[in-house]
Amino acid sequence: MKKVLYLVAVLFTGALTLVSCDKNNNEGEGEGPLDEDVKTATVDSRAYNKWIYFKFSDGSTVEHEIEPIGGTYNGALNYSLSLPNGTTNEGSSEDQKLEISRVDENTVKITLKDFKSGNQSMGDIETEATVSVAKSKWTVKAENKDVGGYTISCDGTIESNTNINLNMSITVKAMQAMNMGPIKATYQGAMEQSANVDESTFDWDIAFHSYDKKTNGGSVLATTEKEIADVTTIPTGDYIQDIKSDSLIVNMGGMMDENIGIGYAQGSVNEVLSAATLRDLSNMPPLYSKTDLVYIVKTKSGEYAKIKFTDYMDEEGNKGVFTFKYVYPVK
């Protein structure tokens, strides 16, 4: 009789153990992988004049200002020099370098590199100029600036695609004493090297500029799921890479004045990731929205991240402050 009771007790205990194990194995069904570490991050991307770079592995950020017109240009320079006898000496250079560097928000330095008038080398010709936006183009202007042995005036425009058109008047004081000059010059060229930060010098995965977003050599796919846990495998499909854009808004000061307009810069954007949070400027005030979808970011190293934007404003209602959940790396 004792043996029978002992056998019943063993069987009953085993049954309880099986029930308990089955319950543990079923926990989390339908919620995705149990070992996923879902992190939350917030990026303040309200500034128009900078990119905020985000790193998935540690959630760190770094920011760098956008320089819309600074850099080295290459173009054609045509000039004429008035001579004492009333004639002109004309010349041109097809590969003339010109540099623009930022002094402050409203001032740049323009340097005509190694300028030659005929066989005479005049070295670098430089002047400071004011910079502003007019009809959505960057304008530069300097009037009778005395720089060493020169007096320089210039005015021109730089478009968002970084094509430059510049008129210059250079009075060389030594030539003026001999009734020569001024030198009248026109310059047309395009930027060949931007003054913006070299993005390959630091680690980052995605970046934010206002409502624009881009990747560091990666690509993005939008899923149809609205919960991170519901994306249980890395989906296949068309992962979209970044594209070049010359319509990054960096100056909104003249948005309501058609004679001023918006200041633009060149850059790259990922249209898929940017569409996760939208801002419609066709009417005022702007309309804001988000898709609630989960996005897959394939990084340059070949790893994957799941990301879902949960808000586009902070607790005070400031728009352009993005909160998102993400999993990285996706296992």
Positions of PLM-derived features:
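Extended lipid/amphipathic-ligand handling interfaces
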Residues: 96-101, 124-135, 153-160, 189
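Sec-dependent N-terminal signal peptides
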Residues: 6-11
